[in-house]
Each structure stands twice: as structure tokens, then as C-alpha cells.
């Protein structure tokens, strides 16, 4: 019982600290250092295009494909897979190179539902495409769910995030992302401290 109370107390303190940080004037300058990771765009067996955004992410995934970094793209996410596929096709990616997972509603489900598909195809390395604020949790989740696969991650084009609208959207999403990181750590055991890439 004492251990349970200790865990609850720690979680409450973590959430309070997170909310304090979100209201701090330091947050707009600090979140990129907390959430963003250094992009890595080496060759991989596949590209994973995470859903949740229909413009910058598919454009970046198509660019990586055209650059020859991977021979195929896996789209995951139930809300916008059709729009993302359409954008990939319009960007010159052949339909035969696209595989769709259309049921995932969360980042954790992205990884869990893709796992059997990647295993079936013998994927041993994958390059994840997502937004800057989502990088840390996305990579942590995929490493947690598929420790035998070598994952690298890259962000969408930074130009959008430098616009006034982009900065506002990024800050809003980053606020929510910090809460999700704490939740994923507490509930699913997904630690945001990442393993080094190998």
C-alpha cells in the first residue's frame, strides 16, 4: 500500500511540475530542446509516415523516398491515411511502394499495429517521419515496442515552424506532448530517455 501511495505521489508531482513548466515564460524557448531530437536521415529498410498531419509529413516522406533512402513507405493512422497516400502519389511515390495501416489512433497503436507488418517484411531498420514536437515520444515508443529494429527519426521541413502560425501551433502541440510523455512513462513504461542509435 505504501509503495502505491508513493507512486501516486510521484505521478502527481510530475504532472504538477509539467503544468508549471507549461505556464512558465521559459516554455516557448525551452520546448525545442526538450522534445526535438537531432534528425537522422540514413538509409533504412523502410520509411514510417506517422498520421496526425496531412501536409508536411507526407511531403517529407516522399522526399526521402525520392532520395533513395528507403524502397517503401508504411503509412499508419486511421484519421488521414487516405489523404497521406494521395499526397505521396502526387509527389511521385508509386502505389506499389506504399503500405497502409489504417486502424491506429495513438502513437502507441502506430507501433503495435505496425509491428506484425514490419516483422512479416523482415524490416530491421526504419526511418520515422513526424513533426518536431513529436520526435522524442515517437522514437521512444517505437524503440520500446520493437527493440530489435534500428529506428532513426527525422522531422518535417522546419520552414513551416518558423512562420507565426507554425510557431503558435507548435507551442500548443508541445504543451500537450509534454503531458503525453509523462502519461506514457507512467502508464505504459515508455521512458523518454532514448537508447543510442546503433
Q: Which role does the model predict for each range below?
A:
Residues 15, 26, 179-180:
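Alpha-helical structural elements
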Residues 18-168:
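A structural signal for short, hydrophobic/glycine-enriched beta-strand patches
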Residues 1-4:
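Positively charged n-region of N-terminal signal peptides that target proteins for export
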Residues 9-13, 64, 144, 187:
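Enrichment for repetitive, rod-forming helical segments
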Residues 6-22:
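Hydrophobic membrane-insertion alpha-helices, especially the h-region
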Residues 166-197:
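A transmembrane-helix-recognition feature enriched in membrane-embedded lipid enzymes
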Amino acid at each position: 500500500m505504501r509503495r502505491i501511495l508513493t507512486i501516486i505521489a510521484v505521478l502527481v508531482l510530475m504532472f504538477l511540475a509539467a503544468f508549471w513548466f507549461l505556464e512558465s515564460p521559459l516554455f516557448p524557448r525551452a520546448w525545442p530542446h526538450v522534445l526535438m531530437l537531432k534528425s537522422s536521415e540514413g538509409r533504412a529498410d523502410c520509411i514510417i509516415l506517422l498520421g496526425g498531419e496531412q501536409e508536411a509529413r507526407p511531403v517529407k516522406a516522399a522526399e526521402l523516398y525520392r532520395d533513395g533512402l528507403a524502397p517503401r513507405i508504411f503509412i499508419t493512422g486511421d484519421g488521414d491515411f487516405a489523404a497521406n497516400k494521395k499526397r505521396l502519389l502526387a509527389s511521385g511515390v508509386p502505389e506499389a511502394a506504399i503500405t497502409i495501416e489504417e486502424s491506429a489512433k495513438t502513437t502507441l497503436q502506430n507501433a503495435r499495429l505496425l509491428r506484425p507488418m514490419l516483422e512479416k517484411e523482415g524490416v530491421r531498420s526504419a526511418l520515422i517521419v513526424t513533426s518536431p514536437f513529436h520526435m522524442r515520444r515517437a522514437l521512444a515508443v517505437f524503440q520500446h515496442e520493437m527493440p530489435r529494429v534500428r529506428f532513426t527519426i527525422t522531422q518535417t521541413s522546419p520552414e513551416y515552424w518558423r512562420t507565426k502560425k507554425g510557431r503558435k501551433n507548435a507551442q500548443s502541440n508541445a504543451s500537450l506532448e509534454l503531458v503525453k510523455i509523462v502519461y506514457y512513462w507512467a502508464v505504459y513504461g515508455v521512458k523518454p530517455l532514448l537508447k543510442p542509435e546503433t
